[in-house]
């Protein structure tokens, strides 16, 4: 994979260390279908490119190039849930521990400024991570932060009928015929996220 590109942007784990890092951190996979194996390892090779060292710990970027709408350290909240789901398989927990802490506590102890710009299923992702590593202490330590995130959505995106609204782009869906950037439509996605978040948070009271 390293030979496919001129590595013009390197972050915490450069191409030169990719093979060693993958061998130490990811679940190794083998199957008779060569191209399937190749896709599997390419995904991990790509994921580690987005692990970034910040002044407050590791973060994970969505784009390697700087984006004008990003938060501190070029982080974008849209993919947090994906990043947690993908990274929960890493053997060394420091990467995902710090990535989560950077989002929720990396802004002078509080959440990143643009964390609520995109829909969130982070409570479900944190629980899914626990299902892999069984680190109950970490999960419960995050509960207060996840509760606060849930309440922020209650304040900003709840309609009078009890449902939640979201715009297309802020829902991570780009543009669609069913929505818009400024319309307050009660989309199935954010309502399912909020329902699952509520269920998970109440289950650990």
Predicted features and spans:
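Proline-centered turn/helix-capping motifs that create local helix->coil transitions or kinks
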Residues: 51-56, 91, 154-167
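Active-site cavity-forming subdomains of large catalytic enzyme subunits
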Residues: 145-157
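Short, contiguous, pocket-lining structural segments
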Residues: 75, 114, 182-193
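Substrate-binding groove/exosite segments of carbohydrate-active enzymes
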Residues: 7-141
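Conserved, charged catalytic cores of large soluble enzymes
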Residues: 196
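Conserved small/polar residues in nucleotide/adenosyl-binding loops
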Residues: 199-205
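Acidic/His metal-coordination segments adjacent to aromatic residues that form catalytic metal sites
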Residues: 65, 103-111, 169-186
């Amino acid at each position: 994979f390293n030979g496919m590109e001129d590595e013009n942007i390197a972050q915490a784990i450069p191409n030169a260390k990719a093979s060693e890092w993958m061998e130490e951190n990811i679940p190794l996979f083998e199957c008779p279908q060569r191209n399937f194996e190749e896709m599997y390892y390419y995904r991990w090779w790509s994921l580690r490119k987005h692990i970034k060292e910040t002044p407050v710990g590791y973060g994970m970027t969505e784009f390697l190039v700087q984006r004008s709408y990003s938060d501190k350290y070029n982080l974008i909240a849209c993919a947090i849930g994906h990043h947690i789901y993908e990274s929960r398989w890493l053997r060394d927990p420091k990467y995902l521990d710090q990535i989560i802490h950077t989002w929720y506590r990396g802004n002078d102890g509080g959440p990143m400024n643009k964390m609520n710009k995109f829909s969130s299923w982070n409570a479900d992702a944190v629980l899914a991570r626990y299902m892999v590593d069984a680190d109950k202490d970490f999960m419960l330590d995050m509960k207060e932060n996840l509760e606060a995130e849930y309440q922020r959505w209650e304040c900003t995106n709840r309609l009078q009928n009890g449902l939640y609204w979201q715009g297309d782009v802020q829902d991570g869906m780009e543009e669609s015929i069913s929505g818009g950037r400024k319309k307050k439509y009660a989309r199935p996605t954010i309502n399912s996220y909020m329902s699952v978040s509520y269920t998970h948070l109440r289950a650990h009271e």
